[in-house]
Structures are given as C-alpha cells and as structure tokens.
Amino acid sequence: IRVNLLGFGAYTANRKHFWSFDLNLRTSVSTQFPYELFHFFKTGESAQVRNLGLSSDAYAEAGFNYSFPIGEKFYVGARVKFLVGLARAKSYFTQFNVSLGENEWYAEAVGELEVNSNLLTIPTRQEAGQDGVYRNYYQLDDMEFDAKFKPAGYGAAFDIGATYEPIPNLLVSAAVNDIGFIAWNKASSMHGTVSRRLTFDGAQVDASGVADIDFDLGELKFEQVDEESATRMLHYTMNLGAEYRLWDRRVGFGALYQIHKYDYAALHNLTASVNFQPVRWFGLSG
C-alpha cells in the first residue's frame, strides 16, 4: 500500500525532460499459511506443518524522479529514494506440528520472531522453561503502541524504467521498482526464538467432526535473545508491458506482466486491457 503525502513536478525548459519529487508512506504484508494448518483448525486432525510465516513493514520514502528521451523512440526514467524505517515484524516457523488434546491443543514449534520498531513495545516476563531454567519470554498479548515518531532504521532504493517504440503505434515498456534496502538499528530491535512444545487452551470437536479451536497469542512463548541490527531488502516489483494503438491512436490493446517479490513467494500477474479514447477528454478502459 502506498499513501502519497506530498508530490510536485515540472517539465524543464525544453519541454522534453521531466522531474518530480514525492513523499509517501509505504506498508506491506506477506503471509505463508500452509493448507495443513487450516485442515487442523477445521477437523482437529494432527498435522505436520512446515514453513509458517507472517511479516509486515512500514516506512516513509522521499523520492526524486527524472525522465528524458533518447532519440525519437526511446524514453528512460529513474527514481532515487531515501527511506526511513518505521516498523518491521516477522514471525516464521520452520516447524509447527499440531495435535489435539482433550480440552487443549499443542504445537511442536521451532521458529523465530523479529521486531524492529520504536512505535511498539513488547514486555518480557521470567518463566521457567521446559528444563526448569528461568528465562525472559516476550508477552505478545501485552504489546503497547506509542504514537511518538522515532525512526527505527534508514535505507535507500531506486526505480528504473524505459519505453521503446520499435514500429509506429507499438509501445513496449519495462521497469523495476524498489531495488534497495533498509538497515534497521539495534536499539529498536526485539528478537526471540522458540523451540519447544506450546500448549493452547480451548479445543473441542463436535459429533459431526467439526473442530472448535481457540488461539491465544499470549501462548506463543518466544524466548528473548540478544538484540541485533539487521539489513533487509525491499520487496521489488518488475513490470513488462506492451500496447498497440489503432484508428489514429483512439483504440489500444495492451498486456502487462508483473512480478511482485514478497518474503515467502513471488506473485506473477498477467493482465490484458482494451482502451478507447475517441476524444482527448473522454476515454474508456477494460
């Protein structure tokens, strides 16, 4: 999600080069929930769950864009961005094997929690582990939010793209966005690990075999470990497009192929479009 906070731009004196500046707030969410986990919550049948994850981040970006033609058929543009990290959270389990008890359910969990933010505080509490040793565990159900703005990291990125008209009325384009990183600082870091059997209260299966299973965030016992700084790449997007126009450029047929890279997977989209613009001030797209 991109929320534009400020933006302005203008052509240079030759009316061919264009520059712009914008300020945006960016957020993204990436998930990976295996089918086996949903099957367990529906039926209560034990399942071996692997690679379960949820991540999100939020940052502000200030970008400067400049674009210009090269010859009569080629047009290029680039955008340089300064990034301010606001918040980042990632929880990932390489193992989350689930089973059902009489009034509770269990998860043999091996995973990790990473949080970078000055807008969020997760308290810890000393509890005895399975070996009887007391350790600090994050209390996820007692998270506190602080509206005070304080950056948790800084970074940089760039976008680059070009269009080319190989023959009259045919325009092809290519672009790559969000090639860059954010370096999250140690002072804003919270880091935890889990490698134990977790117990969640509230589970039953009715006569028809449908499970009613409760999930309590406070039962996720991540042991506090040493905080550390982290540098993470952004989720890039690649666009490849083509459009052909007919009837004095009033009708256009286009195709766009997109690749969105997330933490756990890459999403591929192919979109076709038809555009009709009989006059300059009116147009239809589908």
Predicted feature residues:
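N-terminal, post-signal peptide beta-strand-biased segments of exported outer-membrane/organellar beta-barrel
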Residues: 1-27
